[in-house]
């Protein structure tokens, strides 16, 4: 630290700080072997964070996080062999925080509207998220690498007041199997040279609707 003209760290002060943190989470920490023994016939909730395309190995490298975010990391991270069915959760539009390829990104007032209406700001940094149209290509890829069997769509109401909705259905007409999702340069090129979109009419207000049957036909489409 002296080499970089930085102040020396107060070791005792930092140890005391870390110990205070430890005391707060102490009762939440357990050895995995205890879980195997005591919870073998019970349901366990595993919590992860960040989207599939930020996965260290399968995301749009190098614009990824420092760990695996796909569902199979449950077994890797916990050491437990888990038999599970994956439900994929996605928004009715696409978002991204920070740099990285985003073929369906919006740079106009619609993108700003989605960010404001959907409260798309970083949880910690409060940084505004980049917003774009729903990208079926990346969604399909995310389903494949997570072995998704069912899908749950969220934030549909954010798009209620728009006149038209676009959905990205392909990248420059390429077949899905020909796309390399780890090649950020290629994905950026798709954004610069145009992705392929399909236009849909909006569905209007869906406030108070409590069943699938009650949803507007445009939304079902």
List each model region and its residues.
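Non-transmembrane, aqueous-exposed alpha-helical and coiled segments at domain scale
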Residues: 1-221
């Amino acid at each position: 630290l002296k080499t970089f003209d930085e102040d020396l760290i107060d070791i005792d002060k930092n140890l005391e700080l870390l110990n205070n943190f430890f005391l707060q989470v102490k009762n939440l920490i357990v050895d995995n072997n205890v879980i195997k023994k005591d919870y073998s016939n019970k349901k366990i909730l595993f919590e992860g964070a960040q989207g599939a395309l930020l996965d260290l190995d399968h995301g749009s490298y190098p614009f990824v996080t420092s760990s695996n975010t796909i569902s199979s990391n449950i077994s890797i991270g916990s050491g437990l062999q888990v038999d599970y069915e994956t439900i994929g959760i996605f928004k009715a539009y696409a978002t991204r925080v920070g740099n990285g390829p985003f073929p369906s990104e919006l740079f106009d007032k619609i993108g700003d509207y989605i960010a404001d209406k959907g409260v798309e700001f970083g949880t910690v940094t409060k940084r505004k998220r980049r917003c774009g149209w729903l990208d079926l290509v990346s969604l399909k890829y995310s389903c494949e690498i997570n072995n998704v069997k069912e899908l749950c769509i969220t934030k549909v109401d954010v798009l209620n007041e728009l006149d038209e909705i676009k959905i990205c259905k392909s990248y420059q007409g390429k077949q899905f199997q020909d796309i390399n999702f780890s090649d950020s340069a290629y994905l950026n090129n798709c954004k610069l040279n145009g992705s392929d979109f399909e236009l849909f009419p909006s569905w209007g207000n869906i406030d108070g609707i409590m069943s699938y049957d009650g949803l507007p036909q445009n939304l079902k489409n």
